[in-house]
């Protein structure tokens, strides 16, 4: 197992030096879900939420959240994002909305945290917009699905966990 990179030899936290790393295309894909009452899911899919287009606003929130990742995660590098894609899917069988975010950059460090942050913010936004009708919604299963680029190459959940 690799050592933790955000701590120096004395155990003090520090921001990792990425200055010597090569600039490469980097991609990360994250996923998460929010489960809710079937009636709440119906409100979302029908576009009947009092606060507006739930998924449209959650998409914009995810993009904004990805851009703010370095402000929220203390040792995360601020990076120039080249693309953020946000996809939602409705799962009637379990009364859930699934969110998948793809983050891309050309840089010296990965975009995993940006993809994970965007996913989290999208799901939190859905909760915020629907909490008046369903305070029991459950957010979960937020995880990295895939990462490409950089020295460590390609990683995919389930293939080399």
UniProtKB/Swiss-Prot annotation:
In what pathway does it function?
Answer: Cofactor biosynthesis; molybdopterin biosynthesis
Q: How does it assemble?
A: Homohexamer; trimer of dimers.
What task does this protein carry out? Catalyzes the conversion of (8S)-3',8-cyclo-7,8-dihydroguanosine 5'-triphosphate to cyclic pyranopterin monophosphate (cPMP).
Q: Which family does it belong to?
A: Belongs to the MoaC family.
**Which GO molecular function, any one, fits this protein according to its record?**
cyclic pyranopterin monophosphate synthase activity
| Residue numbers annotated as active site | 128
Tell me what organism the protein belongs to.
Methylobacillus flagellatus (strain ATCC 51484 / DSM 6875 / VKM B-1610 / KT)
Question: Lineage, please?
Answer: Bacteria, Pseudomonadati, Pseudomonadota, Betaproteobacteria, Nitrosomonadales
What GO terms in the biological process aspect are recorded for it?
Mo-molybdopterin cofactor biosynthetic process
Gene that encodes the chain: moaC
What is the designated name of this protein?
Cyclic pyranopterin monophosphate synthase
């Amino acid at each position: 197992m690799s050592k933790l990179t955000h701590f120096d030899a004395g155990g003090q936290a520090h921001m990792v030096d990425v200055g010597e790393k090569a600039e490469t295309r980097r991609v990360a894909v994250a996923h998460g879900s929010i489960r809710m009452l079937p009636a709440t899911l119906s409100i979302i899919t029908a576009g009947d939420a009092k606060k507006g287009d739930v998924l449209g606003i959650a998409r914009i929130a995810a993009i904004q959240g990805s851009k703010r990742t370095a402000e929220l995660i203390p040792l995360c590098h601020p990076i120039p994002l080249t693309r953020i894609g946000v996809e939602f899917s409705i799962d009637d069988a379990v009364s859930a909305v699934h969110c998948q975010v793809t983050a891309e950059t050309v840089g010296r460090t990965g975009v995993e945290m940006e993809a994970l942050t965007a996913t989290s913010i999208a799901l939190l936004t859905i909760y915020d917009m629907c909490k008046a009708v369903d305070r029991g919604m459950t957010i979960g299963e937020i995880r990295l699905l895939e990462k490409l680029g950089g020295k460590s190459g390609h990683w995919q959940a389930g293939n080399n966990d």
